[in-house]
């Protein structure tokens, strides 16, 4: 059996809200295999974003274990968590969060240069990803000169720039009109499949969820098969 790209064992997460304790995750187990694209669904407030933040090493669970590519993350120093995030994980959010003063290509070059990749190969990788997303003509445009769908495509390219092994996406097309969302989502799936990486994608849209390899639901703080 290959090592899971992501594995959660008995993950819990509670928040204190005044005198109350809110138990959002109550023992979530999940494995995402290499190359597998998994849809994460569940009603609003079920804890999808919380789960993704924990998988992305942006938040720590109250208890339980998170493994990324077989690496147990619980005892890692902040520096090691940052490196693991940089080298293994890509993130796409509902809002693109692109750098407004930089071109589409530069937005994809920046994270690569932070990871120590030279400017020339970084530019080549940006051009390759933008071409796959049908955005070659737009590579010198700034985000403000792009449509919402184009901006989100650039954000997807940026997330894949450093060749992560796992993509985490939180409602990646939730901010787009239905037709644009449909096209951008298909482009995202094609790119993720083409690059052979694993993905965990939260969505409220059942049609989009059905296009993934498997659907899991968050119910009462646990992950259950849909
Ligand atoms: N930092 C926090 N402090 C306190 N409560 C929080 C915090 N983060 C999330 N919560 C609570 O945890 C619950 C789950 O939130 P979360 O955003 O993970 O749900 P979600 O399934 O992603 O919802 P949506 O589909 O609406 O985005 C909510 O009740 C939320 O208010």
UniProtKB/Swiss-Prot annotation:
Segments traversing the membrane: none
SUPFAM superfamilies linked to this entry: P-loop containing nucleoside triphosphate hydrolases (SSF52540)
Predominant subcellular localization, coarse grouping: membrane
- Pfam families under this entry? ABC_tran
Give GO terms: molecular function aspect only. Answer: ATP binding; ATP hydrolysis activity; transmembrane transporter activity
E.C. numbers: 7.6.2.-
A biological process (GO) annotation for this entry? Answer: protein localization to outer membrane
Catalytic class of the enzyme: translocase
The residues listed in the UniProt record as binding ATP, with positions renumbered to this chain, are: 42-49
Q: Where in the cell is it found?
A: Cell inner membrane
Query: What keywords are assigned to this protein?
Result: ATP-binding, Cell inner membrane, Cell membrane, Membrane, Nucleotide-binding, Translocase, Transport
Q: Which GO terms describe its cellular component?
A: plasma membrane
| UniProt superkingdom | Bacteria
What region holds the ABC transporter domain?
6-226
Q: What topology does it adopt in the membrane?
A: Peripheral membrane protein
Biological role:
Part of the ABC transporter complex LolCDE involved in the translocation of mature outer membrane-directed lipoproteins, from the inner membrane to the periplasmic chaperone, LolA. Responsible for the formation of the LolA-lipoprotein complex in an ATP-dependent manner.
Q: What family classification does the UniProt entry report for this protein?
A: Belongs to the ABC transporter superfamily. Lipoprotein translocase (TC 3.A.1.125) family.
**Assembly behavior:** The complex is composed of two ATP-binding proteins (LolD) and two transmembrane proteins (LolC and LolE).
Q: What is this protein called?
A: Lipoprotein-releasing system ATP-binding protein LolD 1
């Amino acid at each position: 059996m290959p090592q899971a790209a992501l594995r959660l064992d008995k993950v819990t997460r509670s928040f204190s809200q005044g005198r109350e304790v809110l138990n959002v995750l109550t023992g979530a187990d999940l494995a995402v295999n290499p190359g597998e694209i998994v849809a994460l669904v569940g009603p609003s407030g079920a804890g999808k974003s919380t789960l993704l933040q924990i998988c992305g090493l942006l938040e720590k669970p109250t208890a339980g274990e998170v493994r990324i590519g077989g690496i147990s993350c619980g005892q890692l120093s902040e520096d090691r968590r940052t490196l693991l995030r940089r080298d293994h994980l890509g993130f796409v959010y509902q809002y693109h969060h692109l750098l407004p003063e930089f071109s589409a290509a530069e937005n994809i070059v920046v994270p690569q240069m932070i990871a120590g990749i030279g400017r020339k190969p970084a530019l080549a990788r940006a051009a390759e990803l933008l071409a796959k997303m049908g955005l070659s003509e737009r590579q010198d445009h700034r985000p403000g000169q792009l449509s919402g769908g184009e901006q989100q495509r650039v954000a997807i390219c940026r997330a894949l720039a450093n060749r992560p092994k796992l993509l985490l996406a939180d409602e990646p097309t939730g901010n787009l009109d239905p037709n644009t969302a449909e096209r951008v989502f298909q482009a995202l799936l094609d790119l993720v499949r083409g690059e052979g990486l694993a993905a965990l994608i939260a969505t409220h849209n059942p049609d989009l969820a059905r296009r993934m390899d498997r659907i899991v639901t968050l119910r009462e703080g646990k992950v259950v098969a849909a």
